[in-house]
Amino acid sequence: MIIFTWEFPPRIAGQLAYYVNRLAAELIKKNVDVYVVTYNNSWTGFHQGADGIKAFRISDKVQPQINVLTWMLSLNQEAERVAADIYYSMKHELDLIDVHDWHFIPAAVTLKRALKIPFVFSIDSIEPHRSRNNSGPLSSSIKSIESLGMAETARILVKSEWMKQELKRYYNASDNMIEVVSPAAESWIDGILATYQKLLEVPAN
């Protein structure tokens, strides 16, 4: 499987980097073959750490960028290329993508439609919480990408019941599409794997 994340050690912008690093490490312990595709403008290419995590770090080929939206949309092209390379190197054995927050949703949707790979949309935060002006054009575009992800995903993963209710409030997300798995729970990784397994039993649309 592939994990898409816009932050991953050593590039750390917040708690998401630590969470994804922990997730990948725990999946490896459960014998899941996992690749992390992430952004790093100063350290690019493939690297496998001592913990077994296989990471592809990509950079933005288009400079300069005018805002976070143009930056991420151009970066998605690189994410798609790397994911396709992984898919073909694995002889089409790539089963699932887990996308963390909105940044790589366009790539996940493209790969779902082109290669029939389902994806999970793991949501750590949403635009109405991040932006002070979430009715402006930039925030409206990001919210549209988040809505696209929720419409196209096979399942939404959140860390709390509160976030589940926020998705229903702001995006009218379907209750039965949202799984709550708290990273504080002792059986956290088993809950994640149970969600993954359910999706592998249903072909991508």
Protein language model features and the residues they cover:
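N-terminal subdomain of nucleotide-sugar transferases
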Residues: 1-44, 48, 186-196, 200-205
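Histidine-centered beta-alpha loop that forms part of the nucleotide-sugar donor binding/catalytic region
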Residues: 6, 123-126, 182-183
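A conserved catalytic-core segment of Leloir-type glycosyltransferases
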Residues: 33-91, 180-183, 189, 193
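Alpha-helix capping/helix-boundary segments
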Residues: 42, 103-104, 162-164
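Active-site proximal beta-strand in glycosyltransferases
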Residues: 109-130
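Membrane-proximal helix-turn-helix segments that form the acceptor-binding/catalytic region
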Residues: 138-156
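Helix-loop-beta element that forms the nucleotide-linked donor phosphate-binding surface
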Residues: 164-184
